[in-house]
Amino acid sequence: TIDYKIEVINKLYILIDKVKKLIYSKLEVLSIDETLDYIIKNKCSVSRFGDGELKLIDNNGIFFQESSQELSSRLKEVIKSENNNHIVCIPDVFDRLDNYSEEPYKHWELHIAKTRKKWYAVLNKNKKYYNAFISRCYYAYKDKKNCEKWFEKLKEIWGNKDIVIIEGKKSRLGIGNDLFNNTKSIKRILCPEKNAFNNYNKILEEAKKIDKS
């Protein structure tokens, strides 16, 4: 059957990647604690990259954003940034996966098996990267005991601050939970839920109107 053939092909990808992993240099991805501590201490800008962003870099669309050469170029520019006040967060999935829950384990095992070469093409093996799972810890890890601590640290980033959330119209980030209950104030700039990058300049102009004093 087709499903059986796909399963065999996927297992072959994973087997081949076990060999590739021995050849490719190990990437340094810091822990969630190290990532959050660094952000809190340095008040830096943060960019998170995952499988969706890699698809867009590769000029392939995802569910809520069509591909474009301009978007691909801009994402490459960001992931390769050497700005001292900016960190790049990537999934900590290039070496070991045994600490992840079953579903994320299977997802990332196959994803990396198929895309390791593409990731390494845009990453610098001599650079220190930070952990993209700072906001996904509850989903990713088998051991959930640190999740509450991590979320409290995450909330320190915007604690007692006036914040602006730029989001899709239907995202409703933080509504119905206490994620932002420690902020001084919240403003929202609502964007199209699909293909928001097509309105990049309009969104940027709205963001520029916000008083940053």
PLM feature spans:
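Accessory, usually C-terminal, subdomains that scaffold auxiliary metal cofactors
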Residues: S185-S213
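Electropositive, gly/pro-rich neighborhoods at or near active sites that engage anionic ligands
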Residues: I2-N181
